[in-house]
Amino acid sequence: MTDTPNSPSKSTTKSASSSTKVIDSLHSKIDELTDELTALKQSHQELTKKHSITAKKNDSFVDQLANAKHENDMLSALLKRKERRILDLEDQFNELTSQNESLVLSNKNMKIRCENLQSNSNANIAEFERLKISYDALIASQMEYKNHYQQELNSLQTAFDNYKLENTRRFEELQTSIVSNDKDIDTLLDSLTNKRKAMDNIYVNKNNKVLQLLGNLAHLAKLHGQDTKSQVEQNVSVIEQLLAKHPDLQEKILEKEKIEVDLAEIIAHSNDVLANSSFDEDTTLINSPDLENNQNFNTTHSTSGSATPNSNSHSLQSKKRKNYKRNSLILKESPPIISENVPSSLPKKPQVNNNLINIPKARSKFNTPPTTPRQFTNHNNDFEVTHQWNGNNNINNHRRNNSVDSRSDNSQHRRNNSYDSRSDHGQHRRQPSQQNNNYNNNNYNNNNNNNNNNSNNGFVKRSGSVRNVNNYNNNNGNANNNGNNHGNKSKRRSTYNNNNNNNSKRNSQLFDNNFVLNV
């Protein structure tokens, strides 16, 4: 069958051939693209390998760069140190150079000085030779002077011997004239008697004032003891309230303050002190026994209820130390919280003190008060009260200058107007009487300062009550040596002086010389 242009078979054949071409072309393109993809994959793999190798090289280069930078910094620091070292060495070199130059200059100066000293030495040797010659000549002249003055001394010795003989004769004449002047001496003795009486009255007034001050002190001590007792009672009540409110108070104190406190012992100690302390009775003064028999009273007095202040204090304190701790506190590695001036414990019940305390008779001849308060060792006493009574220390400093016995010049200035016509001004009196007067002066001067309270002057220690009162005992000793002779005005001075050793008492002993405070 013939194909026509418009026949369906022809068109089908054309379309089949064109699709085959397209398929072939597509297959060829696919093959080309497959080949190209394969080539690209291979190139990509190669580039990936090259990239990894390049990255590793880059990392190694970065590490090398960091190492090089670090090495560069180290080298820069080392270079700076080297430069500083060079500068230091240059400074040292310059300093050593300057020292060398100064040493060279000093060496030159020392050489010049040595030359000058050598020249001076030569000049001194020549001067020494010249002075030696002059010294020999001077020795010869001095020997001549010595012989001359020796002769003059011999003549002066002869004149001095003659002068001594003349003065001896004159002294004997004066001695005879003194015998005729005993009436003046008797008049002076009468005047001295009146002055002694006036002085005794002054002593009595002073002692009464001291008694009044002591009474005031005892009253103040009582008030202070009562106040202290009330404070202790308040403290005990406060501690008991705290214990009732906080039973574990002791553990808390130990935990917070690092201090072990025995509160039960503190309360027991305080209650014992409160039970044994009493300040309700008044303080009174009692008289002492006879003063002539109390010389060794402190060592022999052993009546019941009395003891010496020291033994009483030590016995009480020894009992306290045995039964109680000092502050009832055990401090463990903590700073001190209690001042040394705070009393360690409260006083026990005061004892009746009938002891009589004697002040030693050895008194200072200078009637001056102490410049500073005396300090006493606190033998575990609970309280220490220091008062200084300066008002009574200077009584004996105001004696009239015409008084004979209170001066240290040993009667060299007795009524100089009676002997103004003589060149010795009344100093050369009859020797035996003068010796007696010297003894009287020494005896009186050793005892006229006995009201200074120089045994613990004006200080009172107390523990709960006034217990140690040996500070106010005035020992008048042998001051009144004229007790039996003033009534007879016609007796001579020798008779008056023969009674210097009598232990008669002066009127100021109304103070009783020794007293105690009875609580």
UniProtKB/Swiss-Prot annotation:
UniProt-annotated location(s): Endoplasmic reticulum membrane
Organism domain of life: Eukaryota
Membrane topology: Peripheral membrane protein
Low complexity composition bias: residue spans: 7-21, 436-457, 468-487, 495-508
GO BP term (any one): endoplasmic reticulum inheritance
Bias kind Polar residues: ranges: 285-316, 365-380
GO cellular component assignments: endoplasmic reticulum membrane
Single GO molecular function: mRNA binding
Keyword entries, A-Z: Coiled coil, Endoplasmic reticulum, Membrane, mRNA transport, RNA-binding, Transport
Region (Disordered): 1-22, 285-513
InterPro entries: She3
Coiled coil: 20-110
One Pfam family matching this protein: SHE3
Entry's family note: Belongs to the SHE3 family.
Task of the protein: RNA-binding protein that binds specific mRNAs including the ASH1 mRNA, coding for a repressor of the HO endonuclease. Part of the mRNA localization machinery that restricts accumulation of certain proteins to the bud and in the daughter cell. Required for the delivery of cortical endoplasmic reticulum into the emerging bud.
Name of the protein in its database record: SWI5-dependent HO expression protein 3
